A protein has these predicted regions:
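Short, P/G- and charge-enriched loop/turn segments at secondary-structure junctions
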Residues: 17, 198-200
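Aromatic- and carboxylate-lined catalytic core of secreted/periplasmic carbohydrate-active enzymes
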Residues: 25-28, 37-39, 54-188, 200-231
Length: 232
């Protein structure tokens, strides 16, 4: 049959999650094999660029915010259990136990901690949270929300407009969440309506953050909190 993925959308794994979520009857969705950290873009040509931690984060947050119930992480060396004296495919040379120190591997826990900080089973994907025009490819913002909280993942740090009226509460508290280290930065309290945001670090690919907005009557996150608690 025809190739099911439109040209130039191969990296947009949020599209595949949305497509699966729209099927009837609805079933749980997960991206079972996204990219692998430190594997070549073209897979078989080890001279191509390697997928890095920022790519791993993009695939993970896009997928989960679009509706996946979890995420699958992979590493080129770990999946092959590369070690001295044992050759591997796809240009893998790093021993698997050294790969356990790679950044993408160690940053996945920050996504888990974020998701489990808020009511998990009421959370839904909701792109109507994004007001105005959304971006294409890496500039696309992906939104998810519960009844009294919302989150928007922004991979490039581009300016975006967010509609606070999509959740409960006349007043809202907002934070930036850094996906690289799980750090929180309180932005302030806001009235309802549409508000424009851009992280102070500016625009660049891989400069990714999550905007968190919460009904001010809720205390999922404290204003003076600088790190979301670990959820085992």
């Amino acid at each position: 049959g025809d190739y099911p993925i439109e040209e130039n959308t191969e990296e947009d794994n949020w599209r595949f999650v949305e497509r699966s979520m729209a099927m009837k009857p609805m079933k749980p969705v997960i991206d079972g094999e996204p990219i692998y950290e430190e594997i070549p873009h073209g897979l078989h040509d080890e001279n191509e660029l390697l997928w890095k931690d920022y790519d791993v984060r993009r695939y993970a947050y896009w997928s989960v915010f679009a509706g996946s119930f979890g995420h699958t992480y992979g590493h080129n060396s770990i999946m092959q259990f590369i070690k001295p004296g044992v050759g591997g495919a796809y240009g893998a040379k790093k021993p698997w136990y050294d790969a356990l120190n790679d950044p993408g591997y160690n940053q996945m826990k920050y996504l888990k901690n974020l998701m489990l900080t808020f009511p998990f089973f009421e959370r839904v994907p909701d792109q109507s949270v994004i007001a105005g025009q959304n971006g294409e490819r890496y500039d696309r913002a992906i939104a998810t929300r519960g009844n009294d909280y919302l989150m928007v993942y922004n991979y490039t740090g581009r300016p975006m407009e967010v509609d606070f009226s999509k959740i409960s509460g006349a007043k809202k508290n907002a934070w930036w969440y850094t996906t690289k280290d799980g750090k929180l930065e309180y932005i302030g309290e806001f009235d309802n309506g549409v508000h424009k945001f851009q992280h102070d670090s500016g625009y660049s690919s891989g400069n990714d953050h999550v905007l968190i907005v919460v009904d001010s009557s809720k205390d999922y996150v404290k204003k003076d909190c600088y790190q979301i608690n670990t959820h085992e």
